[in-house]
């Protein structure tokens, strides 16, 4: 199995169905590339990424598990985020939440 690989039957399948999403414009203001994995709490990503952080609180990239998005220096792109599921308790990352959302 390859990380992010989906082994499913034929037909259409909607990922993250019924979960809230938000779209944000992200700019890499730094001088190094920044890569963000599929399940990283987007609110807590590298400070060199400029975007509406409050809108991203409790959300992650809406991409397949095991994949990532790379932001090159000076690059601006629009990404879709999906709400975190489960108990919505966040520990670690950059230590900005350390508890329930």
UniProtKB/Swiss-Prot annotation:
Name recorded for this polypeptide: Urease subunit beta
CDD domains in alphabetical order: Urease_beta
Organism of origin: Paraburkholderia phytofirmans (strain DSM 17436 / LMG 22146 / PsJN)
Entry's Gene Ontology molecular function annotations: urease activity
Residues of the signal peptide: none
Pathway(s): Nitrogen metabolism; urea degradation; CO(2) and NH(3) from urea (urease route): step 1/1
Description of how the protein assembles with itself and partners: Heterotrimer of UreA (gamma), UreB (beta) and UreC (alpha) subunits. Three heterotrimers associate to form the active enzyme.
Keyword Hydrolase recorded: yes
InterPro entries: Urease_beta-like, Urease_betasu_sf, Urease_subunit
Locations listed in the record: Cytoplasm
UniProtKB keywords: Cytoplasm, Hydrolase
Xref: Pfam families: Urease_beta
Known catalytic reactions: urea + 2 H2O + H(+) = hydrogencarbonate + 2 NH4(+)
Family: Belongs to the urease beta subunit family.
Gene, per the UniProt record: ureB
Enzyme category, top tier: hydrolase
GO aspect biological process, one term: urea catabolic process
Top-level taxon of origin: Bacteria
EC numbers: 3.5.1.5
Cellular component terms (Gene Ontology): urease complex
């Amino acid at each position: 199995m390859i990380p992010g690989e989906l082994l499913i039957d034929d037909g259409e399948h909607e990922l993250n169905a019924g979960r809230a999403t938000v779209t944000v414009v992200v700019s890499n203001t730094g001088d190094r590339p920044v890569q963000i994995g599929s399940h990283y709490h987007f609110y807590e990503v590298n400070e060199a990424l400029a975007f509406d952080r409050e809108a991203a609180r409790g959300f992650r990239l809406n991409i397949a598990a095991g994949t990532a998005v790379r932001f090159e220096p000076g690059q601006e792109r629009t990404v879709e985020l999906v709400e975190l599921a489960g108990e919505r308790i966040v520990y670690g990352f950059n230590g900005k939440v350390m508890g329930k959302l």
